[in-house]
Amino acid sequence: MLEVSNQHIDNKKLSDEELIIAFQNGNVAAFNELVLRYKDKLVNFLFRYTGNRDDAEDLAQDTFVKLYRSKHLYKEIAKFSTWFYTIAINTAKTDSRKKNRYNSISLSEFDPDEDKDYELTANVISPEDSANASMEHHYIQKAIDALEDYFKEVIILRDIQDLDYDEIAEITGLPLGTVKSRINRGREKLKKSLSKIYNNKT
Amino acid sequence: MQEQEEYMEIRDKLKNLPKIKSDDNFEIMLQQKINLAEAEMQTISEKQNYSTDEKKSFFKKIFTRKTNYWLIPALGTVVIILIIVTIYYPYKKTELIPNAPVSQTLSDKVSDSPNVSRQTTIEEKKIENKLAEKNTTSEQSSDVPPKDIKNLDGYYRGGIEKELSQPTPVTPMKSDELRIKKNDDIETINAPAIEEQQKIESKSKESEQKDSRIIESKKEEERKGGDLSIEKSAPANKDEVGKSGKLKGAKEYKKSDKKNNRAVTDSTKTNEDDLEIIRNEILEKEKNK
């Protein structure tokens, strides 16, 4: 028990990169330490990205499972947080694609004269979420959900997760200038949508 | 800086959003998912290992020395047998087919079935003609003297060269006869070989006649000369000898006949040489007497 507790203390002192290397060498306690460090950050990021807590929790668990299975793919060149957020965003994107396939409803079936398809997303905020969060937070989240995915991910990573521009560029795989412009354009869109929401509210 | 100030309000609002924390069951749920993933990985690895083990064991069974080293010569013999069966026998069959007596088989089928009337086609006729021609040409090329005594007499008379140049007579076979069914009447047609043989026989007869004429003329000349007698010259044929019946020099004739046989075996000698030898022999006999 002493050895386990000592190991736990040692893992707390280690950096993320050192922990993942320790896990690669077979130290499962290092993985547990990484889970403790990143589970809340990851759930928060994924909740803002998906707008659904349950989905966020599931996606966060899937991300950790991917980390567990593909630990050997990490190399010391990149920061662990960058690599880990990249996995999280990819899992979130694939999941959203799957859900969009099943939740889309075709209106052309009801109106045969119309050739265009109107796709409606079936994202519904649960009563629990709406009860917990204040109305403002709820509207902000609604405005974030309304953004396109490529604006959403950069704004969340920058303004909510407090990551650097360089790190965001690495995660998204975009040039630094593109990342900055996308962040500004996303903020502009968010501002407009929030003003509309507030105007409608008033 | 102006841009940052412009979006400062939104940035603050986003930063002030409440931090969502994971559930208490998060780690338990994560552990369950990890266990499931490990189980899947194990099944996949087991399948891969099973497939690799199966392959290894298969090759080991065949090629390892410890277990089945005796299989190597056995496999070698099997391979050799296969080669013999697949390559040697087919070639052997192809070699045998051309040597088979085609003429006999084809013609005998026609001739040996007299009760069964068969219609011979033009192609069969052509084949028969070709075969007959081949037989005649092959017999012409051979320098073997005829076995009949009549022909030997002909050689003795001095027609050796002619006989050698002429084709040896071919005995007509039943197979050379073709039976054609025309309006329920069976007609027999002689093959060209028979016709050729008949021609050859007629030629040989003519040559014999010529020889006999020459001999007779010689005898007459000898009579005129008064030195030579009929007794010491061999007759044209044995039949003639039989007819005359009372030849005094019968023993001498036998001896000369043997010598003639020897002369026939020496087929390389020319006709003129033979004639000279015969004359010399006759002269010597007369001198001895």
Q: Predicted segments — roles?
A:
Chain A
Residues 1-41, 192, 202:
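N-terminal module of bacterial RNA polymerase sigma factors
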Residues 14, 141-178, 192:
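Helix-turn-helix DNA-binding module
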Residues 24-25, 64-79, 98-99:
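Sigma70-family region 2
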Residues 35-53, 70, 144, 193-196:
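Amphipathic, Lys/Arg- and hydrophobic-enriched alpha-helical face
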Residues 44, 58-65, 78-90:
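Structural recognition of an alpha-helix C-terminal capping motif at a helix-to-coil junction
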Residues 72-76, 86-107, 185:
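Arg/Lys-rich amphipathic alpha helix in sigma70-family domain 2
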Residues 96-119, 131:
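Short, basic/polar amphipathic helix motif occurring as a linker/hinge flanking DNA-binding modules
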Residues 114-142:
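Acidic, proline/glycine-rich intrinsically disordered inter-domain spacer in sigma factors
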